[in-house]
Amino acid sequence: MSSSESVENECMCWAARDPSGLLSPHTITRRSVTTDDVSLTITHCGVCYADVIWSRNQHGDSKYPLVPGHEIAGIVTKVGPNVQRFKVGDHVGVGTYVNSCRECEYCNEGQEVNCAKGVFTFNGIDHDGSVTKGGYSSHIVVHERYCYKIPVDYPLESAAPLLCAGITVYAPMMRHNMNQPGKSLGVIGLGGLGHMAVKFGKAFGLSVTVFSTSISKKEEALNLLGAENFVISSDHDQMKALEKSLDFLVDTASGDHAFDPYMSLLKIAGTYVLVGFPSEIKISPANLNLGMRMLAGSVTGGTKITQQMLDFCAAHKIYPNIEVIPIQKINEALERVVKKDIKYRFVIDIKNSLK
């Protein structure tokens, strides 16, 4: 590597050094741009609960120093000679994965998120053996396949959360045909994912009911996000009154909860999609079978549907509700994420604060 390449590849970032999860300034080296790569200056990065999990080694597989961040938005500064879809100056996004085998049935169908050899954007092991570093950094180099075009008139700070929170609910909603005007949707939980499910539901022409254990969420659900109904899920009478009334349910709740009361809300042949991660699922087979209901899980989405979602949000002027912060506030922000003290997604202003 030449001295000029060395300077070009140097990357400022914030990293966790140990399971305390405390982040502080750090410097890493990004790879040089190869034939199919895109290098982008990161302007914004969303803050996801995954950043807490791996910064604090909650799954026991964190590799330090760890640079979080997989909701990345920025501007192209360099492209490899074979790159066809991007040019310098384009607005681009990078989501939860940055590589895959590109040969399996899932990759061939644009479902790279399901590839057995997929590589996470941070704390992953790339195919060259290196550990991936995420978007709490000044720039990143990614194969063009895993980059997304952000429409030029769509704010970069708004695009960032779409690349995890947005696609996590958009993908299953599209997969299970939850875009039928006039149908009814229930959204369980009103955080980063839940508020996007409400926004998509409204854009699809659905009648949306929000379920929460907190009455404090009522005003924002109805008046801020435009849901038609709000239900306290711990209120037996409210839940009973809605039995067999919903076509679809999207469960974004992160904590453990009973499933049967929600399953009873679905009409015959209704669909319940789980995108949260409770420690276990317990459900009555009769509730599932006799109602001919479907229970499905989902994660994020492949490259094809992620690009579709970005275009849809731009066309329909759908924007996540965000709080923009400087990177110097990230440790405080992560604590607030744990405490659910955010409406509804933090976005780091990398461009103006990472110096």
Curated annotation (Swiss-Prot):
Q: Which GO terms describe its biological process?
A: lignin biosynthetic process
Q: Which residues form a coiled coil?
A: none
Q: In which pathway does it act?
A: Aromatic compound metabolism; phenylpropanoid biosynthesis
Give binding positions for Zn(2+) 2: 101, 104, 107, 115
Q: Which UniProt keywords apply?
A: Lignin biosynthesis, Metal-binding, NADP, Oxidoreductase, Zinc
List the record's Gene Ontology CC terms alphabetically.
cytosol
Report if keyword Hydrolase is assigned: no
Q: Where along the chain is Zn(2+) 1 bound?
A: 48, 70-71, 164
The UniProt record lists the keyword Metal-binding = yes
Record text on cofactor binding: Binds 2 Zn(2+) ions per subunit.
Cite the GO molecular-function annotations of the record. cinnamyl-alcohol dehydrogenase activity; coniferyl-alcohol dehydrogenase activity; zinc ion binding
Report the family membership. Answer: Belongs to the zinc-containing alcohol dehydrogenase family.
Q: How does it assemble?
A: Homodimer.
Q: Which PANTHER family match?
A: ALDEHYDE REDUCTASE
Q: What does this protein do?
A: Involved in lignin biosynthesis. Catalyzes the final step specific for the production of lignin monomers. Catalyzes the NADPH-dependent reduction of coniferaldehyde, 5-hydroxyconiferaldehyde, sinapaldehyde, 4-coumaraldehyde and caffeyl aldehyde to their respective alcohols.
Protein name stated in the entry? Probable cinnamyl alcohol dehydrogenase 1
Native organism is Arabidopsis thaliana
> What is this organism's lineage?
Eukaryota, Viridiplantae, Streptophyta, Embryophyta, Tracheophyta
